[in-house]
Amino acid sequence: MAIIKYKPTSNGRRNMSGSDFAEITKTKPEKTLLVSQSHTAGRNAHGHITVRHRGGGHKQFYRVIDFKRNKDGMAATVKAIEYDPNRTANIALLHYEDGVKSYILAPKGLKVGDKVYSGEDVDIKVGNSLQLKNIPAGTTIHNIELKPGKGAQLARSAGVSAQLLGKDNDKYVTVKLASGEVRLILAENRATIGAVGNEQHELISIGKAGRKRWLGFRPTVRGSVMNPNDHPHGGGEGKAPIGHPSPMSPWGKKTLGKKTRDHKAKSEKFIVRHRRAK
């Protein structure tokens, strides 16, 4: 993938950039792997806003991704690399020997025609999926499970990868995540070899507000320009200070620097080294 710089034909396009989609080999998705989805605009079942600054956006179909990779011992051929509007990574269309089709996250270096496998005794090759206990130390991995059989939850964004540092015992392995956090993960969990593709996604510049609206984002208004009944920073004559010793969230809680990690969380015992540890 390469980054396209647009000509400054307007102020909105002056610093805009995008992908050339050179890796994409198929433009129309597999119909049997599509699910319709409706946008909720950040509302819950009661109609209350639970996530601010969401709404609108282009209509999208959800691509059903195989995060479990549990068809062991069966070869799957990569038939296409496709764009997925629901995530930053590209996806790969697989055709299994028994005729089943599925999507997986497209790892860096995976090409059309390659064969990928899942199972215990598969090769340490990009795109293959196996249990962490069968992966050598130092291997780059992605698409990592946290609970056996639940499906991958970690290292799924474009360009992201983790590294398997070692095996402490038969039950746990030590993995260094992209954030720098080092944590223990059950050795029975599966992971996929390699890093997620589309690694230059982070270099794309949105360029203009309208392009963000296409993605389903609405404007973010500063609290200091609101009324005092809408935000703790609001009110005052003209451009006034926030009136608090620390910045506040819209709900009156300290923010911008306040620690939000619960050190009594059950997952704390699995963290060997925090991401902000010096």
UniProtKB/Swiss-Prot annotation:
Residues 223-278 are annotated as: Disordered. InterPro entries: NA-bd_OB-fold, Rib_uL2_dom2, Ribosomal_uL2, Ribosomal_uL2_bac/org-type, Ribosomal_uL2_C, Ribosomal_uL2_CS, Ribosomal_uL2_dom3, Ribosomal_uL2_RNA-bd_dom. One of its GO terms (biological process) is cytoplasmic translation. Keywords: Ribonucleoprotein, Ribosomal protein, RNA-binding, rRNA-binding. Belongs to the universal ribosomal protein uL2 family. Part of the 50S ribosomal subunit. Forms a bridge to the 30S subunit in the 70S ribosome. This is Large ribosomal subunit protein uL2. The lineage of its organism: Bacteria, Bacillati, Bacillota, Bacilli, Lactobacillales. The gene is rplB.
